[in-house]
Amino acid sequence: MTDANGAPAEAAPQIRMQVLAQYVRDMSFENMVAQKGLQGGDVQPDIQVQVSLDARKRSVEHQYEVITKFKVTSKNKSGSAETLFLLELDYGGIFHVENVPEDQLHPFLLIECPRLLFPFVRRIISDVTRDGGFPPLNVDTVDFLALYRMELARRAEAQKAAQPVQ
């Protein structure tokens, strides 16, 4: 592309992102029915997955920590509706991010970074549920863009509700 004088237009610097580390920050798995066992086909699980995200700047320039928090609850749909298991997982990543405009950094960190972490989160959840005595749970893909938009709408609503009526 050229400008009006025929000189090449200066290209915007290319966004650079590098995953420096990934780790389980915190994890808990509670098997509520371990003593009872899961004999028979009378168990119909109702799986609920809650996802939240957090990002913060680190002391090193261009480095950010992004944490994905998953809370997975399985209840028995039939009969008593007792909780079968509860899994809580905080999975983090350290990212080196450069050349992202300041006004786009927050959505970038809370959409693109969790997208890269998600396959590892899914694998951990699958392995832990299997190792906990249940069939492996393959969590559906999370739409992090929709999750980000819902959080923005929730914050806007909360801010609107907090403003005094004139």
From Swiss-Prot:
One of its GO terms (cellular component) is cytoplasm. InterPro entries: SecB, SecB-like_sf. Keywords: Chaperone, Cytoplasm, Protein transport, Translocation, Transport. It is found in: Cytoplasm. SUPFAM superfamilies: SecB-like. Pfam families: SecB. GO terms for molecular function: unfolded protein binding. GO terms for biological process: protein folding; protein tetramerization; protein transport. The keyword Transport applies. It comes from the Bacteria. Its main location: cytoplasm. Homotetramer, a dimer of dimers. One homotetramer interacts with 1 SecA dimer. Belongs to the SecB family. One of the proteins required for the normal export of preproteins out of the cell cytoplasm. It is a molecular chaperone that binds to a subset of precursor proteins, maintaining them in a translocation-competent state. It also specifically binds to its receptor SecA. This is Protein-export protein SecB. It comes from Cereibacter sphaeroides (strain ATCC 17023 / DSM 158 / JCM 6121 / CCUG 31486 / LMG 2827 / NBRC 12203 / NCIMB 8253 / ATH 2.4.1.) (Rhodobacter sphaeroides). The lineage of its organism: Bacteria, Pseudomonadati, Pseudomonadota, Alphaproteobacteria, Rhodobacterales.
